[in-house]
Amino acid sequence: MEVVAYYRVSTKGQGESGLGLEAQREYIKFAAEQHGWVVVAEFEDVGVSGGIHPLERPAGAKAFADGHPVVVAKLDRLSRDVEHIAGLMKRHEFRVATMPTADAFQLHIYAVLAEQERRFISERTKAAL
C-alpha cells in the first residue's frame, strides 16, 4: 500500500535538533517495513501545536490532500484534540506507526489521552513561568 508520511514537532528547537523528527522517521520506516507500506511522499510541520487542526497546518493539509493514506509515528503527532481525530477518522484514511492495527475504539481512547496530555503540558508550562 502506498502511503504518505506526516511528521510534526511543536517547537522550532525540536525541528532544528532533528531529534524528534528523526525518531518519527524511524517509527514510520519500521512500520512500513513490517506492513509492506511504500512511503511515496513526506510532509513535515515544525513549530506547530498539536491543538491546531491537521488540515489547518501547511504540511498537514498537503499530506491529507495527497490522496494516499497518511501515516504518523504516534497519534499525538497528528493531533492532541479528540474532535480533530474523530473528524479525520470519518473523512480520511490514516495509520499510526506505533499501533498500526488499532481500531476506531482504540484510536478514540488514545485521542482522549493525547488531549489530556496537552492540558498537562500547558499547565506545567504556565507553572514554570
Located regions from the model:
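Short, structured surface patches at the beginning of a domain
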Residues: M1-A128
